[in-house]
């Protein structure tokens, strides 16, 4: 297994984000969300979301950073193990207060997108492994 990966997200309300991500079924780092202006959410082994108060995020990236989460200039895409798991994850996100943005189903690829309460866009997708190896971008060996 390689090194851990972190996505850093500015949020307006840390407590709301904590509730949203735990309702999504993701877990919290044990020392997170304890008055530091930040928290770490474990998406799955090796994948984390660092949520920072807007002030803490501004300190990290500096003043005058263009864009807001609602711009959706970044889509955080996570692949899952099955077609049905796409729906399970996104349905939990919607029950937790997320908003559905888009969905695609081509049989060999299933994708649904949602925005979290701060407007960050997430794409949950599944690609049939057999179909992916037949795609022109993946030459046969």
Regions found by a protein language model. Give the residues of each.
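N-terminal beta-strand motif that seeds the catalytic metal site of vicinal oxygen chelate
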Residues: 1-19, 24, 75-78, 128-141
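Vicinal oxygen chelate
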Residues: 4-12, 41, 63-92, 94-141
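Core segments of cupin and vicinal oxygen chelate
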Residues: 8-58
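Hydrophobic/basic alpha-helical segments enriched in Actinobacteria
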Residues: 16, 23-28, 33-34, 67-70, ...
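Alpha-helical elements of the RecA-like P-loop NTPase motor core of helicases
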Residues: 18, 87, 122
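A short, acidic/glycine-rich surface segment
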Residues: 57-64, 132-134
